[in-house]
Amino acid sequence: MAGRSMQAARCPTDELSLTNCAVVNEKDFQSGQHVIVRTSPNHRYTFTLKTHPSVVPGSIAFSLPQRKWAGLSIGQEIEVSLYTFDKAKQCIGTMTIEIDFLQKKSIDSNPYDTDKMAAEFIQQFNNQAFSVGQQLVFSFNEKLFGLLVKDIEAMDPSILKGEPATGKRQKIEVGLVVGNSQVAFEKAENSSLNLIGKAKTKENRQSIINPDWNFEKMGIGGLDKEFSDIFRRAFASRVFPPEIVEQMGCKHVKGILLYGPPGCGKTLLARQIGKMLNAREPKVVNGPEILNKYVGESEANIRKLFADAEEEQRRLGANSGLHIIIFDEIDAICKQRGSMAGSTGVHDTVVNQLLSKIDGVEQLNNILVIGMTNRPDLIDEALLRPGRLEVKMEIGLPDEKGRLQILHIHTARMRGHQLLSADVDIKELAMETKNFSGAELEGLVRAAQSTAMNRHIKASTKVEVDMEKAESLQVTRGDFLASLENDIKPAFGTNQEDYASYIMNGIIKWGDPVTRVLDDGELLVQQTKNSDRTPLVSVLLEGPPHSGKTALAAKIAEESNFPFIKICSPDKMIGFSETAKCQAMKKIFDDAYKSQLSCVVVDDIERLLDYVPIGPRFSNLVLQALLVLLKKAPPQGRKLLIIGTTSRKDVLQEMEMLNAFSTTIHVPNIATGEQLLEALELLGNFKDKERTTIAQQVKGKKVWIGIKKLLMLIEMSLQMDPEYRVRKFLALLREEGASPLDFD
C-alpha cells in the first residue's frame, strides 16, 4: 500500500522507550504491525508498532536511540508504510548484539549471565523487527544497557518446515525475532562490562604471546627448557579465551621465582618476558628500593605497585589485561619473618603486605609477579606456596648446548660484519668453557675483542689507532684462547692456582703403593662420572704425616677434569669462628651442587675440626656440619666426588666419621731402602755415584719417611758442598728416625 505522511514525535513515556517500538495512535495503525519509515528516498528503517492514546493522530513517536539511529528530529515529516515479513526468509536465526552500560556512571564489575540476558531479550522483543545497525535500550536486572545490532542471520528454512537442519545460513539486513531465535552478546570495545555464560561471542583476543619473538633476537641462550617450563606453568592458561578458563574453573599462576647462581640470566629472562608478551610494560623494582626510612612508606610502596592492577580488575573483571611486576633481589624485602634483628619489624610488615596483595582476601587474577634471587633459602616460606610464587625455576649454569647458543648470540654481530675470523670454532669454545655462566661467556667475548683491538693500537707517545690495520680487524681463535687462559675464570669452575701449589713438585711414583692410590682414585672418578646409582662418591686418604696425601688428592682431582674443583682447606679459615667455618664449608658444597660434575677436596680434616690430643678438644659444631655435608646427596642430575685427607684415622674413627666416607685408601710412607732409592732416582737430585753410595747404606734395610719429608731433607742436603752432600743426607735421615742407626 502507498505510504502516508506522518510527523515524528518524542516517545510519551520511559516504559514505552524500553519496548523498542514506534508508538502511534490506534486510529492510525494497530499494535504489532510493522512499518517502513522513509526519511529520504534512499533511507528506510523498519519498526514494530505499539499504540498509546497520548500520541496525537498523524504522529509517530520514537525513543532517543531510535531517533539517533534513523537520524530523525522532532516534527520531521516522514513517509510511513506497512511492511509484511516473509517468514520463510526473514525469521532471525542468530543475531549478534553489541552491549554496554547505557550510562557510564552506573558501571560495575558484577558478572552478567548472557544466557539469562538472551532469554529475557527474546521475551521482551518477541515478534519485533530488527535491522543491522539498529540502536535500542534493554533493561535487565534493574540496569539499563545500550544495544547495537551488529549482525543478523536468517533461520534455516528447513527448521521452519519441521525438517532436519541443512546448515544453510544467509545474512539479512532486516529480520523478525521469533521464539527460536538465538542471541549472542558481544561486549563493546573498551567496555568494563563483565559478561559470562555461553550466549556471548568469542572475542577477537590479541594473542598474549608476541608473534615475532625468538630466543636469539631476545638475547637469551641456553634456557630453552626453563623457558618452556615457565610458559607451561605460567602462561598456557592465559593464552586461552577467558570463557574457557572460566568454564574450567582455572586460576592463573600469579608468581614465578627465578633462582640460581649470579650471571646465569635471571634478570635477563625476566626483562625479556615483558617483551615476549603482548602486555603493558612490566614494572621492574629492585628489592631495596621498596624500603623507606619513614614508618609505613615501605608498605605504601608495595600497595602502589598493585594499584593499577586493582583498579583495572574492578573496572574490567575477567577481561583485565595482564600486569607484570618484577622484583629483582627479592630476598632483600622478603626475608623470613622474625629473622631480622631489632624490634621495628619493618621487614615483617613489608612481607605481610606483599603476601596479602598477591593472594589475600581480595584476590587479583590479572597479575604476574616475578621474583629473582640467588638466595632462595632466605625467602619467607609463605611467599612460596601455591597461589603466590608457586613456580620455582632454577636458572643454573648452562650446559654445552646452552653455551653454544650464548656464544652464537654474543658473536652474531661480529659474524654479520665479517669481523670474526674463520678459524674461530664456537663449538670448541663451548667445550672449553665448562661451568661458565652467561655473564662470564659475554665477558670472554668482550675480552677477546679487547685483545684483538689492542693489536691495532700504535705503541707511541700518544695512544693512536692504526686505521689502515683497523680496517682489517679480525677477532681470532688465539684471542679467545688467550682470554680464556688469562682474563676470564668461571666463579663455579676450577681455579688451577687452588691446587697447583699442592703438586708443584709433581707426583713421585716411588712404588706400587702410590700407583695403587692413583689407580683407585681414577676408578672412583669414573664411578662418579658414569654411575647413576651413586651420584655421591666420597673417599678418605689416610696415612702418616708427610706421606703426600694432599698432593695425591689434588692430583686425583686434577686428573678427573671435572668442571668444578674446590679445596676446602684449614689454611683458608685461620681465625674463623665455628659458625664462620660451617658457613664457609657450606658455601663450597652449595657451589658444588650447581655444577653437573664436581669434586671437593676436604684437606686435613682434624685441623678443620680444631682437634688437639690434649684434653682432647675438638669443635663439635664443625664436626656435625661436616658429617651432614659428607652424607648429603647432590641435587638430581648432579654428581659429586669428595676426597678427604687425614693423618689421624683413629681420631676420626672415634668421632664416627669414617662411616661417612664411601671408602678409605691408605697412603703409606716410604718403607724400604729400594723405595727410597726409586724416589731419589725419580727426583734426579743426586748423581749416579752419589746414589750408589746411598744405596750401599740403605739397600735391603727398612726405612720410614714420608715423601714430603724426604724432599725437604734432599733440598737441605743439596745446600752443602758436593763432597759432603751424601753424608749430610744420611745424617739427616738418621736424625729424623727414618732409618736404622747403623748408617756409616
From Swiss-Prot:
Top enzyme class: hydrolase
Example GO molecular function: ATP binding
Record: residues binding Mg(2+): T550
Signal peptide range: none
Modified residues (Phosphoserine): S207, S569
UniProt EC number: 3.6.4.6
InterPro entries noted in UniProt: AAA+_ATPase, AAA_lid_3, Asp_de-COase-like_dom_sf, ATPase_AAA_core, ATPase_AAA_CS, Cdc48_dom2, CDC48_domain_2-like_sf, CDC4_N-term_subdom
Gene Ontology, cellular component aspect: Golgi stack
PROSITE patterns hit by this protein: AAA
Binding residue positions for ATP: N505, G506, I507, I508, K509, W510, P545, H546, S547, G548, K549, T550, A551, L552
N6-acetyllysine modification, residue list: K105
Pfam (any one): NSF_ATPase_lid
Disulphide connectivity of cysteines: none
Main subcellular location: cytoplasm
PANTHER family, per database record: VESICLE-FUSING ATPASE, VESICULAR-FUSION PROTEIN NSF
Family under the similarity heading: Belongs to the AAA ATPase family.
Protein's name in the database: Vesicle-fusing ATPase
Gene designation per UniProt: NSF
